[in-house]
Structures are given as structure tokens and as C-alpha cells.
């Protein structure tokens, strides 16, 4: 099994990150708007993106947003994105990315990490439960 290398994402990774997000959402997005948003997020000190590489190829990423929540009176690390390309699933890439984000949040003083995932993503639900997460809330959304 090839070694999994983790590293921070940079503006030079925009195309690779775009491909990962398209895989996650099973959709394509306006590439220019994505580039603008991704580069803005890279400048935000509370946003952290890390990539996973196998044999030099980007195969996964995680996005961590550090936020002070008033209802916790503490910092929380929100996992906003976690995606692994199909060819790299089952190789512990997701677990390594998640462990990185948890340690990053811990080092930043966060009391917990949290995330949401689509109700249809049963494999993701099993993954997060296996990684020690528990289902504790319902999330509601409304298109505007």
C-alpha cells in the first residue's frame, strides 16, 4: 500500500480541490466562482484545508473551520468537507485526514469537532460512527 502524505492546500491546488468537491457533491460548479471562494477561504486564518496524496496524486481533502460558538462558550472545529476519491477509499485516507483535523482543532483550543453529512450518505455515516462520532443533532436547511 502506498504511503499517504498529508499537506496543507494552497492556491496552486485549486483544480485538484475543485475536482474533489465535484466528486463530493456529484455535481459541477462555476469554476471561476469556486476559485474566488477557495482563495478567499485560504486567506482566512480560521479556515484550514489539508490534502491527502498517494504516490504524489491528490486523492482526498478535508476542510476545517474554527469558530467560537456562543452556545458552547468555546471554540469548535467544524469539518466542512471531507472527501476521498473512489480509488483511494478503504486505504485509511479519510481516517488520516480526520485525525489531522481533530488534532488541529485541539491545538487551536477547540472543545470538539462537529460535522454534518447528507442523510443519503450511509457509508459516510458508518465511517463517522466508526471514527468515534455520535449523532447528536438534526440539521435543517432552507434554500433562499
Curated annotation (Swiss-Prot):
Catalysed reactions, as listed in the record: aminomethylphosphonate + acetyl-CoA = 2-N-acetamidomethylphosphonate + CoA; (S)-1-aminoethylphosphonate + acetyl-CoA = [(1S)-1-acetamidoethyl]phosphonate + CoA; L-lysyl-[protein] + acetyl-CoA = N(6)-acetyl-L-lysyl-[protein] + CoA + H(+)
Keyword check for Acyltransferase: yes
Primary enzyme class: transferase
Domain N-acetyltransferase: 4-144
Gene disruption phenotype: Cells lacking this gene have lost the ability to utilize aminomethylphosphonate or (S)-1-aminoethylphosphonate as the sole source of phosphate for growth, but are still able to utilize the other aminoalkylphosphonates 2-aminoethyl- and 3-aminopropylphosphonate, and alkylphosphonates. They are also much more susceptible to the bacteriocidal effect of (S)-1-aminoethylphosphonate, even with phosphate or D-alanine present.
Source organism superkingdom: Bacteria
GO biological process, one term: aminophosphonate metabolic process
Note: The sequence shown is that of strains K12 and B.
Chain's role: Aminoalkylphosphonate N-acetyltransferase which is able to acetylate a range of aminoalkylphosphonic acids, including aminomethylphosphonate, (S)-1-aminoethylphosphonate and 2-aminoethyl- and 3-aminopropylphosphonate, using acetyl-CoA as acetyl donor. Is required for the utilization of aminomethylphosphonate and (S)-1-aminoethylphosphonate as a phosphate source via the C-P lyase pathway. Is also essential for the detoxification of (S)-1-aminoethylphosphonate, a structural analog of D-alanine that has bacteriocidal properties due to inhibition of cell wall synthesis.
Name of the protein: Aminoalkylphosphonate N-acetyltransferase
Name of encoding gene: phnO
Amino acid at each position: 500500500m502506498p504511503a499517504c502524505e498529508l499537506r496543507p492546500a494552497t492556491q496552486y491546488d485549486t483544480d485538484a480541490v475543485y475536482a474533489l468537491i465535484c466528486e463530493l457533491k456529484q455535481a459541477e460548479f462555476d469554476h471561476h466562482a469556486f476559485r474566488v471562494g477557495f482563495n478567499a477561504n485560504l486567506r482566512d486564518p480560521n479556515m484550514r484545508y489539508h490534502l491527502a496524496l498517494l504516490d504524489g496524486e491528490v486523492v482526498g481533502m478535508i476542510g476545517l473551520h474554527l469558530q467560537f460558538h456562543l452556545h458552547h462558550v468555546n471554540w469548535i472545529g467544524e469539518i466542512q468537507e471531507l472527501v476521498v476519491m473512489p480509488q483511494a477509499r478503504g486505504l485509511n485516507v479519510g481516517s488520516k485526514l480526520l485525525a489531522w483535523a481533530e488534532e488541529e482543532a485541539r491545538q487551536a483550543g477547540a472543545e470538539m469537532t462537529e460535522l454534518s453529512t447528507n442523510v443519503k450518505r450511509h457509508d459516510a455515516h458508518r465511517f463517522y460512527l466508526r471514527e468515534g462520532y455520535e449523532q447528536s443533532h438534526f440539521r435543517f436547511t432552507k434554500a433562499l
